């Protein structure tokens, strides 16, 4: 097998611009160069995808489980293999398994499951997204209220230390967590996201001043923008730095609301699927209703894949195709400080590339 391959398609989106009549030359697992198709050396094996689009592969920073295995209910490596398979079915080669508000022992079990998955050679899983329990019960959504509380600094340290190098994101409500707790988490290299929060505009901005760089699922489970109290939503929209995830499935937010947020936030807005799976045991029991999930009648998760999110953004939200692709690749990579090696088709970057058709259906992951 040759060491290098040239991949050709009708269009290439590099993460920065669109190219036609070009090829991506890959050597081992890195992008060697992007060149005009006519200049590909004859001794390099060519793989052509007529009618296809080459684009940076996607990354999903919030997904709870797949194929009947919710991680919080089945905290084991098999759940992560299924979750990763689901992500790849929509073009996401990296994902952040997520556990909602729960007992400490469940968080520990999920941390252990990820370590076991990695030890077995499992790929794609970046770490754990801990969503709660340090949130505001007023904005609990489908979270279990009995576990929700304001943490002591010692509790924060204990969980973070147990999850060292595994916990990568923590969603919390800034108004229920101390400055010391927030700064400690950030100091351990974990991304803190404001979510499930009833913060006032002032409280939200105070949290941002402590270093909180983003918010979780914009619009959902957060204090809304009102003309006399702009809330967390208003603080995010008003910021020029704070990023936010959004779920473009048409259920978590109307497509017009997604479009408005995009017009205001531009490159600060990125996609998550927030995908769950059906389960009838444990604290979180999700029932699929159409193309969404509910728990006791409350919207509790999506049935999105990342490529479906791209389709929705382009079709319903008036987002340009390249920008929709960036929202699923480059921008989440930036959140995780991965954008020096992921999110672009560029010399030296990892060869994590999706092949899509003109409707953004997944053909292949390279």
PLM regions and their residue ranges:
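Conserved, mostly hydrophobic/aromatic
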Residues: 130, 185, 215, 313, ...
């Amino acid at each position: 097998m040759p060491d290098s391959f040239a991949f050709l398609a009708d269009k290439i989106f590099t993460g920065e611009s669109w190219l036609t009549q070009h090829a991506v030359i890959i050597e081992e697992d890195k992008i060697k160069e992007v060149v005009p198709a006519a200049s590909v050396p004859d001794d390099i094996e060519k793989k052509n995808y007529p009618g296809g689009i080459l684009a940076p592969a996607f990354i999903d920073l919030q997904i709870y489980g797949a194929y009947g295995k919710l991680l919080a209910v089945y905290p084991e490596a098999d759940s992560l293999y299924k979750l990763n398979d689901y992500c790849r079915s929509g073009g996401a080669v990296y994902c952040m398994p997520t556990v909602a508000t729960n007992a400490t022992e469940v968080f520990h079990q999920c941390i252990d499951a990820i370590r076991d998955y990695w030890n077995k050679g499992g790929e794609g899983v970046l770490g754990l997204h801990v969503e709660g329990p340090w949130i505001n019960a007023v904005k609990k959504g489908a979270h279990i209220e009995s576990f929700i509380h304001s943490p002591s600094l010692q509790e924060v340290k204990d969980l973070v230390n147990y999850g060292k190098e595994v916990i990568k994101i923590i969603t919390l409500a800034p108004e229920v967590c101390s400055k010391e707790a927030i700064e400690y988490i950030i100091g351990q290299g974990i991304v803190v996201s404001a979510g499930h929060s009833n913060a006032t505009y002032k409280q939200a901005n105070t949290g941002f001043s402590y270093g909180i760089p983003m918010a979780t699922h914009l619009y959902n489970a957060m204090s809304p923008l009102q003309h006399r109290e702009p809330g967390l939503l208003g603080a995010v929209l008003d910021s020029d730095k704070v990023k936010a995830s959004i779920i473009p499935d048409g259920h978590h937010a109307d497509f017009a609301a997604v479009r408005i947020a995009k017009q205001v936030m531009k490159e600060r807005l990125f996609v998550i699927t927030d995908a769950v799976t059906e389960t009838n045991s444990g604290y979180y029991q999700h029932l699929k209703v159409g193309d969404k999930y509910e728990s006791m009648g409350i919207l509790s998760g999506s049935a999105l894949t990342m490529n479906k999110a791209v389709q929705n953004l382009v079709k319903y939200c008036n987002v340009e195709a390249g920008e929709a692709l960036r929202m699923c690749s480059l921008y989440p990579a930036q959140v995780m400080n991965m954008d020096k090696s992921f999110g672009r088709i560029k010399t030296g970057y990892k060869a994590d590339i999706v092949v899509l058709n003109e409707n953004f259906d997944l053909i292949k992951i390279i």
